[in-house]
Regions:
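…and closely analogous acidic/polar surface helices at protein-protein or active-site interfaces
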Residues: 28-34, 43-78, 97-104, 116-117, ...
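Hydrophobic anchor at the start of a short beta-strand
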Residues: 76, 124, 171
């Protein structure tokens, strides 16, 4: 379409493409997407006086608004994760608070998978808003935590979840 406009405006012998000739198509996809948005509410989101939770909530609210207005047939679920993961409603998102929690990324991913498993459409994705490293998880022996550096045991479980997501075509 852009080349056709350029030919019409400049003539066949001398092709000059001007900005008025350019046509941009905004295609509308009919496929539906199920999205889970994970938000870290661990203590480090406000540690040392640095407020990371407010920008995280703003990004989350912008993403929700974008999906709800641009893709009204899509679904978006939100969960928070600290020591535990729990679903939160969109209306409660602005009031989300950081707690004296660690970062249980494994629990967050497990809950995200549970939510997506219940969705009927095939297109699924997970977004995670976090400031750092996973520092705890539940094991058969109880609550395991390690805030000092990267813990190989916790990281391995996170990587296992990432492989599971890839296997299930969840980016």
């Amino acid at each position: 379409e852009s080349l056709k406009n350029a030919i019409i405006s400049s003539g066949e012998n001398e092709l000059t493409l001007k900005k008025e000739d350019i046509v941009v198509w905004d295609s509308n996809h009919n496929s539906q997407m199920s999205t889970v948005l994970m938000i870290d509410i661990s203590h480090s989101m406000i540690l040392y006086g640095e407020d990371r939770i407010t920008p995280a909530k703003k990004v989350a609210m912008a993403l929700v608004e974008y999906i709800k207005t641009k893709f009204p047939k899509d679904t978006i679920d939100i969960l928070s994760f600290g020591d535990e993961a729990r679903p939160i409603s969109i209306k409660d998102l602005p009031y989300l608070k950081v707690g004296p929690y660690h970062t249980n990324t494994v629990a967050g991913l497990d809950l995200a998978f549970d939510i997506l498993r219940r969705k009927k459409n095939n297109n699924k994705q997970i977004f995670m808003i976090t400031d750092g490293k996973p520092s705890c998880m539940f094991t058969k022996d109880g609550f395991y935590k390690n805030s000092a550096g990267l813990d190989d045991f916790i990281l391995d479980q996170c990587y296992n979840r990432a492989r599971q997501a890839k296997k299930n075509n969840i980016p």
